[in-house]
Amino acid sequence: MDYNVKDFGALGDGVSDDTAAIQAAIDAAHAAGGGTVYLPAGEYRVSGGEEPSDGCLTIKSNVHIVGAGMGETVIKMVDGWTQNVTGMVRSAYGEETSNFGMSDLTLDGNRDNLSAKVDGWFNGYIPGQDGADRDVTLERVEIREMSGYGFDPHEQTINLTIRDSVAHDNSLDGFVADYQVGGVFENNVSYNNDRHGFNIVTSTNDFVLSNNVAYGNGGAGLVVQRGSYDLPHPYDILIDGGAYYDNALEGVQLKMAHDVTLQNAEIYGNGLYGVRVYGAQDVQILDNQIHDNSQNGAYAEVLLQSYDDTAGVSGNFYVTTGTWLEGNVISGSANSTYGIQERADGTDYSSLYANSIDGVQTGAVRLYGANSTVSSQSGSGQQATLEGSAGNDALSGTEAHETLLGQAGDDRLNGDAGNDILDGGAGRDNLTGGAGADTFRFSARTDSYRTDSASFNDLITDFDADEDSIDLSALGFTGLGDGYNGTLLLKTNAEGTRTYLKSYEADAQGRRFEIALDGNFTGLFNDNNLLFDAAPATGTEGSDNLLGTDAGETLLGYGGNDTLNGGAGDDILVGGAGRDSLTGGAGADVFRFDALSDSQRNYTTGDNQADRILDFDPTLDRIDVSALGFTGLGNGRNGTLAVVLNSAGDRTDLKSYDTDANGYSFELSLAGNYQGQLSAEQFVFATSQGGQMTIIEGTDGNDTLQGTEANERLLGLDGRDNLNGGAGDDILDGGAGRDTLTGGTGADTFLFSTRTDSYRTDSASFNDLITDFDPTQDRIDLSGLGFSGFGNGYDGTLLLQVNAAGTRTYLKSFEADANGQRFEIALDGDFSGQLDSGNVIFEPAVFNAKDFGALGDGASDDRPAIQAAIDAAYAAGGGTVYLPAGEYRVSPTGEPGDGCLMLKDGVYLAGDGIGETVIKLIDGSDQKITGMVRSAYGEETSNFGMSDLTLDGNRDNTSGKVDGWFNGYIPGQDGADRNVTIERVEIREMSGYGFDPHEQTINLTIRDSVAHDNGLDGFVADYLVDSVFENNVAYNNDRHGFNIVTSTYDFVMTNNVAYGNGGAGLTIQRGSEDLAQPTDILIDGGAYYDNALEGVLFKMTNNVTLQNAEIYGNGSSGVRLYGTEDVQILDNQIHDNSQNGTYPEVLLQAFDDSQVTGELYETLNTRIEGNLIDASDNANYAVRERDDGSDYTTLVDNDISGGQVASVQLSGAHSSLSGGTVEVPQGTDGNDVLVGSDANDQLYGGAGDDRLDGGAGDDLLDGGAGRDDLTGGTGADTFVFAARTDSYRTDAGVFNDLILDFDASEDRIDLSALGFSGFGDGYNGTLLVQLSSAGTRTYLKSYEEDLEGRRFEVALDGDHTGDLSAANVVFADDGSAAVASSDPAATQLEVVGSSGTQTDQLA
């Protein structure tokens, strides 16, 4: 029941104190057994009670407070309040409150107008007492301007949820979780709070934080910690997703906590560490993006350290142990010291696997723990591996989860605490698991055995049947039994103190498997602790990497985008939810799907969660879809799966076209071409339960097959068979031989696969007999036999004939094969006038447009006649409409969306060739036409197309925008056109687009076609999926040659050519609306030349590859990347562009989309490799990356030359150049980032504040004027200063250069041009060597000023006071001045800085 507070006297006028009225409504709801207290929009002022714990409003069991929305309904503290308030809204102190909460409103603490500590929300039971608040829900709540905490669920609460809520501008933490059990924070935002964004403290456990965001807070973004009292630490905490950025301290701090997982989050821009693990145990940090932290000083991106609480409340020293870091991408800021740093304070047992680390200043990883490890490979699931030798070893574990491998010898293994795996290997081993759930693994029968005369069995000393397990899955035993036939006998000794698992089957050496366990385990073994089959390798709800072994096993990925590899053995792979990558490996593997959502796709939203099988072997492997209800292969409808080969021919998709309520349908991809190789043998389909179909198969003999009430497929094969489908909608295929076919009840299909399945000769009959054909629901499928329809039995037709008695109907061909066999089937009964294309399926026919009245004389309007032929083909179930050579004039039919000619399912237009068959718009047409030839608006059309003809828009003699070809389903609706093929078609003289497949089309192919002299683009691909443009030409179109836009993905362009177009040759772009970007595009081969703008323009798109193309002679840039991500430009020839102005050959820049999305799209992660790039005389650069946020560009092994300003300019802090050749450019005066290669490079920064990085090789770095950062990289590098004003300071400011990695043993600083004579006191032409007070930076300083007050100074990172000498600093009088002008011929690469002025002249 709802209780409106205004009915209780609340005013919500922002002035009156409404506390009493709202509380009265709460009390009334509680008295009635519960209800909703509703606060309409308004500002409700409230005041506190006598004690802080009285709060303002006390909520009670079964009561929920609901407003009209955040910012609409506001509960605000009265002005001038002076007493602390522990929760403006709170549960009652000392009472257990349950099933209560708050939603859709704002709490405002009004902290600027009061003088007390006020918290927003508070609930929880008395600390240390037996009791708890339960089932608390807060949704869509904003808490702001508190002088205390925002959300403060405090002490002993079970099952609290806070979601979709916001805390900001509060004096302490935004969100607190204090002693919360089984709760969740989901999709919340915490910003601009004076302390932490989220603070998880004091015994909180079994708690989940999912997709929360914290930024701009005065403390950390997220803290999980014990707190200031000696209480149990937080544990079993999962932090999944979300972002923690721009906070003053850490992004995430885990302090005195254990068993915490942080995964799938982005953590960046924080003042100190990105992640700090501080006296915590068993922390997992998985698959996060951690970057650009350490904004307020020099810190590691991830720090692992112990916490000294010996002088604190516990008196303990908390060592950080068992930290697991895997799959993280870590990139440092300019201040970041290490990617991952372990302090030398006892921190140990850190395990680092497959992390990507770059951009840090000191080193990627620094580990001090004796047992800490780092690997580039993925982890195995255990936190460490202890391995013995071939001798007698004693291995002892720790509190971590470890794998102990004894190898050969009589070993003693002790796992200690943790969930350990113990594998003694060969020899007689003594195995002690210790505390935790341990697994005793046996990898070979000879690891533990006895003979008739001696025992060599292993002894397990402390097996716990409740939590330990014995893994025998590699040994081939089937279970417990009598010790024979692959079983094991369980036997105890006479005293009952020892248990044996024994096999009595000996090998050739008389060895029979046996293990011993201390204790009596009779009746205690079960499937959970005695594993005969391999235990499943299980993932998590995150993105996991599971790798099998040589044994047969089951891999369960669960949620996330998992990678499963079965290895050898006959494995079962179950990816679970998410987009998974599945590799069976060697053996006969089964890929199993347990839910439709395990592998699904939504063509409306573009969400692709389809799994990929990478190594399917149709001779061994199988795909199990039995749990999904699929009954067989088919057309993708009604419980079948369609087999669809993609346009490139390198991927086979299994697709259902039946969507769920959210628009998702099942889809699965197999790498490779499996057309013709897939049948029911490769699948496990649904059983016959619940109306689903199964297969009943005969032999080569005379079979009787009987169906059931289910939908079944009966295959008679050879022989004289009798098939009866029974009930259900069945498919009956008798195969060869004279068969009798009875469908039974239901809508049955009688399928004939070859003409010899049912035939007669001149002397005998071998025809099949259908005994119970029902023309109203049954069908005869002859689609594969080549018959076009009913007729006289000749010319590919069948004669319908009834016997004289009227008791039998025949379908007969009189055309015999070489053996005199002519097709014939018989039906019991007289079906005269009852058989047609609705119940007999023929092969699509050819419909000549001239038979319908078309003239093709270039004058008559042939539209009605051609449309009649199309309609006839459609009515016949599909066919080809043939237009002989001629010019067919057509007119519009009505609305723009009606076009001229409307194609339908299964219908293809075909002519006699380009220029021979011409469909041309009539003179004088003044109507807009969205497709002269098109599919129907609002209908899903499939299996249609056009070939061997020309469409002519006649634009000189018409008005109105006219497009050539158009197809596609309604944008944003659930549906799509499918399987569209256009071949050898010319489209010309349109006032609009040429080819315009527009919105939601799956599997379209346009090949060997031409578009020219059209008013807009030649070819458009708008929301195309799994489609291809191949061997097409677009020229002289007024806009772009090819335009790929709006959500198009999984798209291939092969060997297309675009020239002479008024825009770009090829554009791939999002378009003008805020829609999904095109993605997963491959452009392979072809040429793009002599276009007015770019040769190729990529704009607001991602995951595009451009390779093996030639791009030249275009008006602006050859290739322009404009707000893109993850683009590859590989092995192209790009030359002689920039014909209409001054542009780079290849330009990378950000796109300002403030007018549509409000976003700035930076160009990121571009790879340019193996290209020949030769700038024209007009080009200012061969390759230029704008200084606009574009970054992470990688140039590898290119041949680059030319450029008026420079050959290469890279402005991104993480961009790099290596390999190949780059012509020597001219220097300029901007703020540059110059990166050398592995060769011996010369880097000249010019003026500006530059960043120079020599990379590998013996490099020369000259920053020039400006305050420069100089990194030599590996090799013997020389830092050259050509003028005293290149690096200096004044009394007012510092403009010195900084050398970041000076190595006194091989690098040199060349000051020979400056006139200094050596080291000294900084006067009389000497330089003083001075160390900073922190001991972290060394300066070379002169105290002698020039006329402008500038005195030379250079800074070096680190303490070099003891290693600078004449051997590594070159002064004017030491005879080594020649170093500054080393022979350029010996230098393989020179990179010169660039101007900050944009000279590209691009719109």
UniProtKB/Swiss-Prot annotation:
Swiss-Prot/TrEMBL catalytic activity: [(1->4)-beta-D-mannuronosyl](n) = [alginate](n)
Hemolysin-type calcium-binding repeats: 388-403, 406-422, 424-440, 557-573, 574-591, 697-712, 716-732, 734-750, 1227-1243, 1244-1261, 1263-1279
Coiled coil: none
Repeat (PbH1) residue spans along the chain: 133-155, 157-179, 180-202, 204-226, 257-279, 280-302, 320-359, 977-999, 1001-1023, 1024-1046, 1048-1070, 1101-1123, 1124-1146, 1163-1185, 1190-1212
Regulation of its function: Inhibited by zinc.
Localisation per UniProt entry: Secreted
Top EC class of this enzyme: isomerase
Matches recorded under Pfam families: Beta_helix (PF13229), HemolysinCabind (PF00353), Pect-lyase_RHGA_epim (PF12708)
Key words, A-Z: Alginate biosynthesis, Calcium, Isomerase, Repeat, Secreted
Cellular component GO terms, alphabetical: extracellular region
Superkingdom assignment: Bacteria
Cofactor(s) in the UniProt record: Ca(2+)
GO annotation terms (biological process): alginic acid biosynthetic process
Pathway: Glycan biosynthesis; alginate biosynthesis
MF (Gene Ontology): calcium ion binding; isomerase activity
Keyword Glycoprotein: no
EC number: 5.1.3.37
Region (Disordered): 372-395, 408-428
Protein family per UniProt: Belongs to the D-mannuronate C5-epimerase family.
The protein's role, per its UniProt record: Converts beta-D-mannuronic acid (M) to alpha-L-guluronic acid (G), producing a polymer with gel-forming capacity, required for the formation of the cyst coat.
Note: Each enzyme of this family of C5 epimerases introduces its own characteristic sequence distribution of G-blocks in their substrates, explaining the extensive sequence variability of alginates. These alginates of varying composition have different physical properties and are necessary at different stages of the bacterium life cycle.
Name recorded for this polypeptide: Mannuronan C5-epimerase AlgE1
Native organism taxonomy: Bacteria, Pseudomonadati, Pseudomonadota, Gammaproteobacteria, Pseudomonadales
